[in-house]
Amino acid sequence: MINLRKTHPILKIINHSFIDLPAPSNISAWWNFGSLLGICLVIQILTGLFLAMHYTSDTLTAFSSVAHICRDVNHGWLLRNLHANGASMFFMCLFLHVGRGIYYGSYLYKETWNIGVILLLTVMATAFVGYVLPWGQMSFWGATVITNLLSAIPYIGTTLAEWIWGGFAVDKATLTRFFAFHFILPFIITALAIVHLLFLHETGSNNPSGINPDSDKIPFHPYYTIKDALGLMFLLLVLLLLALFSPDLLGDPDNFSPANPLNTPPHIKPEWYFLFAYAILRSIPNKLGGVLALLASILILLIIPLLHTANQRSMMFRPISQTLFWILTANLITLTWIGGQPVEQPFIIIGQLASMLYFMLILVLMPLAGLFENYMLKPKW
């Protein structure tokens, strides 16, 4: 009898996607993050579902309902800690996944890359609305500051901000709709992830060398299922260490105080994974300019395929591009640090220089490095 997984209409799709999928024989651990992101998404949906059973999206009871989950619900503290730190793990995997794509030239699969950028934006939106739900001080003021940026849009800005708020400020209507968004968006992310995979399987995976791997493929199972399982062990180890030993390490102490519109925290800042973009926003002393720079810092990923000038796909054999890539990485870490600092010297000038370097590297220096490397490869005699 022919194997059921190869004939059954549904199992056949799963088989072609995760079992008999031909994969390059040389993909490294940097290719683990796709599966880890899928697992992060499942963890977030499951923990979020159980949290939603006990959470109330009302300004009067939201904060105390989160406290109730942590104190009175069976293993509620664990669910909350896994969900909060799961978001951090999600973004860690996302940044590494995008970094891998830039380093090895995976962005040349344009459809897969563009869906990936849309996924990144959707995950960022989900994390933002989710951070508002506990209704602590930083939740409230973070929501106020970021949604207020919409008012910088000429002509329609104020109307747009009030439409999002459902009133004249962040209040009960805002919290209720943010809870609704936070519930639905992960399912939209799941659908987008399936489309992302669909486009990826049209072309097959890239590999570290950037050379067409069609002549040397191996089945995904058991080789890469085992490899992904190892990655999963590391992910769960770090997540559990965070959730069980220092669950509040990455959070903000201000969020232990209930939201108070009459008392502004000394330093309003988002979660660590938004700090790089927040630093770019703050580095421009103009509201609309800052908003445009914030958008550009993420949307610039969409034009990376158009800026590829090198004859080789991967950076594996391109030392100048490699150097610039690691300067970009260090620059993003610097921006993340600056985003968490108060708006005073020397942080202002460091942030402005780092923001300028970020755009310079992607738009000018990396394409020029590609052209120079092409020139260096040509025989000179």
UniProtKB/Swiss-Prot annotation:
Residues annotated as transmembrane: 33-53, 77-98, 113-133, 178-198, 226-246, 288-308, 320-340, 347-367
Chain residues that bind heme b b566: H97, H196
Chief place of localization: mitochondrion
PROSITE patterns, per the entry: CYTB_CTER, CYTB_NTER
Domain of life: Eukaryota
Cofactor(s) it depends on: heme b
GO CC, alphabetical: mitochondrial inner membrane; respiratory chain complex III
Subcellular locations according to the entry: Mitochondrion inner membrane
Gene Ontology molecular function: metal ion binding; ubiquinol-cytochrome-c reductase activity
UniProt cofactor note: Binds 2 heme b groups non-covalently.
Keywords of this entry: Electron transport, Heme, Iron, Membrane, Metal-binding, Mitochondrion, Mitochondrion inner membrane, Respiratory chain, Transmembrane, Transmembrane helix, Transport, Ubiquinone
Pfam families (alphabetical): Cytochrom_B_C, Cytochrome_B
Record keyword Plastid present: no
A biological process term (GO) from this entry: mitochondrial electron transport, ubiquinol to cytochrome c
Chain positions recorded as heme b b562 binding sites: H83, H182
Cysteine-cysteine disulfides: none
Binding site for a ubiquinone: H201
Membrane-protein topology: Multi-pass membrane protein
Family stated for the protein in its record: Belongs to the cytochrome b family.
Assembly description: The cytochrome bc1 complex contains 11 subunits: 3 respiratory subunits (MT-CYB, CYC1 and UQCRFS1), 2 core proteins (UQCRC1 and UQCRC2) and 6 low-molecular weight proteins (UQCRH/QCR6, UQCRB/QCR7, UQCRQ/QCR8, UQCR10/QCR9, UQCR11/QCR10 and a cleavage product of UQCRFS1). This cytochrome bc1 complex then forms a dimer.
Functional note: Component of the ubiquinol-cytochrome c reductase complex (complex III or cytochrome b-c1 complex) that is part of the mitochondrial respiratory chain. The b-c1 complex mediates electron transfer from ubiquinol to cytochrome c. Contributes to the generation of a proton gradient across the mitochondrial membrane that is then used for ATP synthesis.
PANTHER family in the record: CYTOCHROME B (PTHR19271:SF16)
Anything else known: Heme 1 (or BL or b562) is low-potential and absorbs at about 562 nm, and heme 2 (or BH or b566) is high-potential and absorbs at about 566 nm.
Protein name: Cytochrome b
UniProt organism field: Dasyuroides byrnei (Kowari)
Gene label: MT-CYB
